[in-house]
């Protein structure tokens, strides 16, 4: 029996997927090294390789992300639209890069790991964004159920699934 390596769906958060004007320079430097040329970077610009064969995609980002421009997501979503690939694209107004599951528990853990990373004002701002950004897990659950035709008896607890993925380190 043949088995496909193609995923049935993708969930992308803060994706570094464009090598053009909006690329994250540090990511491409780490990936390709200092001697990469434009052709290599172009090859890794995912939005330029979207075809109708691409699996459905759930994409989320925050406009305030100073690490990875939300334009990465806009470019990819537009490429999906043009290719006829089913997708959901959610952009939240507030929130820093890497908010992961965006729960208070997650943020408390981050504060323990790196207490000096954010000023009190930045901490308050992130706390304020948790409710909105944290919606992505529920949105992803509904999207997955619809996209993968998951029956009610196969209920996925989205917060638990995504939290367990985060806790296990599989998100890295």
Can you say where each PLM-predicted feature lies in the sequence?
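Primarily recognizes the serine-hydrolase "nucleophile elbow" in alpha/beta-hydrolase
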Residues: 1-27, 37, 41-42, 160
